[in-house]
């Protein structure tokens, strides 16, 4: 059966060298999820699609979409660059992690349904300067279902009550209310704010929000909570996530150094 050209929407996830003049380009498509495209001659000077296949470019394309093996791009109809992501290291790091997480969560060649719009909404929020950690945390909560984990966020898993203080339990697979905290001595001891945001994030449609304000202390606890769930229950340790953690560590060191500018000098021996 001859393969035919099809129009599709997509965002460039990443690309890598293939042979001397060619590239393999991973695109998150609206119709078939993540697909790997072979782009012949993409590294040649003056290649007509050069700007259309840069990372964090999105738009309308035409190509051959393969159920198995490599797909092919024929043309780009209209494309745009997420320039805010490309110009900022922090935004770039979180957007890269988001797309790597999505790549792990969805099989190649399977339609995404509403997920494509949710991912694009997340990228657009990051691109326009919204807090990238908060945006990515929303998707981390929602993508757990795709990985086969379905925490109960909105009520106690034992009695179903939602009107009492709640805390998260990995052992029980969701929230415990105050009356059932004893069911898990290793519950997370989350603050009410963190619990409230986890419950909100589980159903939040990013296409319908402009901003979600989260204070720094709650952001830290949200980050630690989701890192622990992904580490303990999925064993998912992505390279892009490690980079974010390292970047946060560098930032904390710089902030500490600025708060204590004389610390290093005070440690030096007299006369040095």
Swiss-Prot record:
Short name of any one Pfam family annotated for the protein: RecO_C
Q: Print the keywords alphabetically.
A: DNA damage, DNA recombination, DNA repair
Q: Does the keyword Phosphoprotein apply?
A: no
Member of which family?
A: Belongs to the RecO family.
Free-text function comment from the UniProt entry:
Involved in DNA repair and RecF pathway recombination.
A GO cellular component annotation here is: bacterial nucleoid
Under the heading InterPro entries, the entry gives: ARFGAP/RecO, DNA_rep/recomb_RecO_N, NA-bd_OB-fold, RecO, RecO_C
> Is Protease one of the keywords?
no
Q: What PANTHER family is this protein classified in?
A: DNA REPAIR PROTEIN RECO
What this protein is called in its record is DNA repair protein RecO
What domain of life does the UniProt record list for this protein's source? Bacteria
A Gene Ontology annotation in the biological process aspect, one of them, is:
DNA recombination
């Amino acid at each position: 059966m001859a393969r035919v050209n099809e129009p599709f929407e997509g965002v460039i996830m990443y690309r890598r060298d293939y042979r001397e003049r060619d590239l393999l380009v991973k695109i998150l498509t609206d119709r078939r999820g993540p697909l790997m495209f072979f782009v012949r001659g993409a590294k040649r000077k003056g290649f007509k699609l050069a700007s259309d296949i840069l990372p964090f470019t999105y738009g309308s394309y035409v190509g051959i979409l393969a159920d198995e093996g490599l797909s092919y791009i024929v043309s780009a109809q209209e494309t745009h660059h997420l320039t805010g992501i490309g110009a900022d290291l922090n935004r770039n790091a979180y957007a890269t992690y988001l797309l790597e997480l999505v790549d792990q969560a969805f099989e190649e060649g399977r339609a995404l349904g509403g997920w494509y719009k949710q991912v694009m909404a997340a990228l657009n929020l990051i691109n326009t300067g919204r807090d990238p950690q908060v945006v990515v945390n929303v998707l981390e909560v929602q993508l757990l279902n795709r990985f086969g984990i379905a925490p109960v966020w909105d009520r106690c898993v034992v009695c179903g009550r939602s009107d009492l203080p709640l805390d998260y339990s990995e052992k029980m697979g969701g929230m415990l209310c105050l009356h059932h905290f004893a069911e898990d001595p290793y519950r997370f001891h989350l603050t009410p704010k963190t619990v409230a945001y986890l419950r909100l994030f589980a159903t939040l449609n990013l296409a319908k929000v402009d901003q979600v304000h989260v204070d720094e202390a709650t952001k830290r606890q949200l980050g630690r909570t989701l890192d622990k769930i992904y580490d303990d229950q999925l064993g998912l340790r992505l390279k892009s996530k490690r980079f974010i953690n390292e970047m946060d560590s560098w930032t904390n060191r710089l902030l500490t150094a600025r708060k204590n500018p004389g610390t290093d000098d005070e440690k030096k021996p007299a006369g040095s």
